[in-house]
Amino acid sequence: MIALIQRVLNASVTVEGQTVGNIGPGLLVLLGVEQDDNEQKAVRLCERVLGYRIFGDENDKMNLNVQQAGGSLLVVSQFTLVADTQKGMRPSFSRGAVPQEADRLYQYFVGQCRERGIETQTGEFAADMKVALVNDGPVTFWLQV
């Protein structure tokens, strides 16, 4: 399971012209689910995302996690993160989980984040989404479990 996390001043996701998720300061989490992923990996990745210290403290050092910084999450499914790009000129998505299982684990990940007390907005699984964001930094990390 992969999370590409971006520290943002704000972010939103729109489906068919309607805003379905919107946050102020926090993290945009692009989430990719692989074939061998499971609930344990979702829990571990949730813990890493929430615990990752990438927000500035009083000395502007990256010492605070998203919850300590008072931020929120916007979680958006993105199957292209699991693409194999090693060969050729077209990505292969053979490592990705089947859609039904990917959706289940995506929802499970979101639920785990919410259970830990952080405001969590979402996109819409498998929809054609428009994601808008204002990067803060920019600060972007690839987390994989």
From Swiss-Prot:
InterPro entries, alphabetized: Daa-tRNA_deacyls_DTD, DTD-like_sf
Subcellular location(s): the record lists: Cytoplasm
GO CC annotation, single: cytoplasm
Q: SUPFAM superfamilies given for it?
A: DTD-like
Look up keyword tRNA-binding and say if it applies: yes
Q: Which reaction does it catalyse?
A: glycyl-tRNA(Ala) + H2O = tRNA(Ala) + glycine + H(+); a D-aminoacyl-tRNA + H2O = a tRNA + a D-alpha-amino acid + H(+)
Predominant place of localization: cytoplasm
One of the Pfam families matching this protein, by short name = Tyr_Deacylase
Motif stretch (Gly-cisPro motif, important for rejection of L-amino acids): 137-138
Q: Which residues form a coiled coil?
A: none
- CDD domains cross-referenced by the UniProt entry: Dtyr_deacylase (cd00563)
**What GO molecular-function term can you cite, just one?**
tRNA binding
Keywords from UniProt, A to Z, are: Cytoplasm, Hydrolase, RNA-binding, tRNA-binding
EC number(s) recorded for this UniProt protein: 3.1.1.96
Q: Name one GO biological process term.
A: D-amino acid catabolic process
Q: Does the keyword Hydrolase apply?
A: yes
Tell me its family. Belongs to the DTD family.
Q: How does it assemble?
A: Homodimer.
UniProt-recorded name of the protein:
D-aminoacyl-tRNA deacylase
